Amino acid sequence: MLSSSHLKPSAPSATLLRFLRSQSDFLSVNSSRCARPSRSKPYVHQILPCNASSRASSTWTCTASAPHRTTLQTSLVRTPTPAARSHSSSRPRLWLCAGQAGRSSSIFPLSNAPYSRSASTKSRPLLRRLLDLRRSNSSADKHNRGGPALIDDGTEGGFTIGRGLAAKATNEPRLRCTEFDKNGNVTLVNGEFKKSELIAKYGLLPRDLRKIDSSTLPHILVRPSAILINLLHLRVLIKHDRVLVFDAYGSTDSYMQSLFVYDLEGKLQQKQTGGFGALPYEFRALEAVLISVTTGLEEEFNGVREPVVRVLRALEEDIDRDKLRHLLIYSKKLGTFEQKARLVRDAIDDLLEADDDLAAMYLTERANGVQREEDDHQEVEMLLESYHKVCDEIVQASGNLVTSIRNTEEVVKAILDANRNSLMLLDLKFSIGTLGLATGTLFSALYGMNLKNFIEESDLGFGAVSMTCFMITAVVCVYGLAKLRKLQRVRMWGEAGVGGAPLTPLTTRSGILSGHRSNWRADSIEPVWGSLPGEARTERIKRLRETAAAAAARSASADATAQRASALRSSANANGGAPKGSEHSPTRETEASGSSA
C-alpha cells in the first residue's frame, strides 16, 4: 500500500499520448484535478504516474494527492450500451492523471479537441445525458470501429480539393492522332495524347487546342513553330518536319480522312529538288489539306445541286405539293452547304490579308535561322490564292443556285395567286348568276300565293310574268358581270396611263396571240409597255411625254393653219373673187404646213 505522500506526477511521453489518443473516443480537459468515478463501488483501478525518484505502483484504493495544476485527462472508456450499462459498476476503469506539460499541450492542441464525456456522468446536464442515452447501438458500434479522427477538420477541405484536382488530371481528355515524319512515313497510328502533352511538346497554347476541338468555325492559325488547321473534316498540326492529323470527331473510319491520309503520304514522300518552284515540307502538307477540302466541297456541291435542278425542272411542268416539299428540304441543305463553303473561303481570305502570318508560315526557314520580311511571301500567297479561287467559284455557284430557288419560289407564288384569283372570280360569277335567278324568281314567288292578282283570266298573263322574270334575271346578271369586269381590270399606271393617254393595249384574241399561250418564262414584255429594248423606266416616261407634247404641237399647228385658210377664203369671197392661181393656195399652205410638221 502506498502512503498518501505528496507526489508530483510527471508528464507522459509523446508516444504514450499518441497511443492513448488513437485508442480513445473522446478527449477532454479537466480544469481542476483528476476526477474520480462517482460510483461508490470500492474496486476502481486507478494509476497515478510518479516522479522519476519514486516508483509508481498500483492499488485498489484511491490515493489522494495534493492539489496541483490543471492536468490532462485521457480516458479509455467504451461507449456503454443499454445492455451493458447495468454491469458497468463491476468493470474496472483506467484513469490516468498527468501534469500539464508544454510538449503535451503542443502535441494535442486543446482548442481543436472535441468535447468529450466527463469522468462523472452525473456532473453533465440532464439534456446531454438524455441525448447520450438515446444513441443507437449501430451508431455506437460504427463510432467505435471508426476510431478517432487523426486529422483536423480544417485540413479536410484541402484534401478534398487535392483529390478533385487529381481526378480532373486523371480524366483529362485525350486526342487521337496520326503522325508523319519528315520523310512522309507514318510513325504513329491512332496515338493518344493529352492536351497538356501536346501543349508542352509543340509549344502551343490551350486556346489553340480549343479551336482545334471546335467543329463549327474553320480556322488556319499560324504559330511561331507550327500551323494549326481546322477545315471541315480535317484537323491538322503542321511542323517543319512533322505532321499530326487528328481524328475527325473521334472516328477512325472516315472516308474523306482516309483519302487525305493517303494523299498526304504521297505529297510528303515526293522528292523536291532545290530549284525554283520547290515547295518546303510545310507547304506540301498545306497543299494536301487544301486539295482535300476543295475536293470535299466540290463533291458535296454536286450531290446537292443535282436534286435541286431536277426539282426545279419538274416544277416548270407541274406545281405539285410534294415537289414543293422536296424543294424546301433541298433548299435548306443548299443553304447549309453555302454557309460552310463561305466560312472556308473567309478563313483563307483572312489568312491572305495578314502579311505577318504569311511570312511566319515558312517554318523550315525559321527552324534554320532564316527570317523573312513581312512582304516576302509570294510562294504561299500564290498557293492560297489558287485554292481561294476554287472555293470562291463553289460559293458563287451555290449562291446562283440559291437565287434560282428564290426566283422559282416567287414565280410559283405568283402563279398560285393568279390561280386563286381565277377561282375567286369564278365563285363571284356563280354568285352573280345565283343573285339574278333569285331576283327573277321573286316575282314568280309573289304570283304563287293564293291571292287575287287580276290576271287569272288573261291569256297573256303567264307569258308576261315569265318574260318579266327572265328580263330581270338577265339585267341583274349583266350588271353584276360588268361591275366585276371593271373591278378585275387593274393597271399599274392607273386608269388612263401616262399623260392622260392609255398605253398600247394587248392584241385581241383574234390577233396573232389567238390560240397561243405564251410561256411565263418569257423575258420580253415590250408589247405591253410599248418600250424599246434596254430602255429604262425614266427614259420610257420621258419619251412618252415628249411624244404626247409633239402630238399636241402638231394638232395646234394644224388648227392654226385651218383658221388662216378659212380667213383667206372669207376675205376672197368678200372681194368678189379670187385671182387665178390663188384658189388652191390655202390647200397648198395646209399641205406645206403638214409636211413641215
Swiss-Prot record:
Residues 552-577 have a biased composition (Low complexity). Residues 552-597 are annotated as: Disordered. Residues 1-56 form a transit peptide. A motif (YGMN) lies at residues 447-450. Signal peptide: none annotated. GO terms for cellular component: mitochondrial inner membrane. The keyword Cell membrane does not apply. GO terms for molecular function: magnesium ion transmembrane transporter activity. The keyword RNA-binding does not apply. It comes from the Eukaryota. It is found in: Mitochondrion inner membrane. Residues 581-591 have a biased composition (Basic and acidic residues). One of its GO terms (biological process) is mitochondrial magnesium ion transmembrane transport. It is a multi-pass membrane protein. InterPro entries: MRS2-like. CDD domains: Mrs2_Mfm1p-like (cd12823). Keywords: Ion transport, Magnesium, Membrane, Mitochondrion, Mitochondrion inner membrane, Transit peptide, Transmembrane, Transmembrane helix, Transport. Disulfide bonds: none annotated. The chain crosses the membrane at residues 423-443, 462-482. High-conductance magnesium-selective channel that mediates the influx of magnesium into the mitochondrial matrix. Essential for the splicing of mRNA group II introns in mitochondria by affecting mitochondrial magnesium concentrations, which are critical for group II intron splicing. It also suppresses a variety of mitochondrial intron mutations and its absence may disturb the assembly of mitochondrial membrane complexes. Belongs to the CorA metal ion transporter (MIT) (TC 1.A.35) family. Homopentamer. Forms homooligomers. Interacts with MFM1. This is Mitochondrial inner membrane magnesium transporter mrs2. It comes from Aspergillus fumigatus (strain ATCC MYA-4609 / CBS 101355 / FGSC A1100 / Af293) (Neosartorya fumigata). The gene is mrs2.
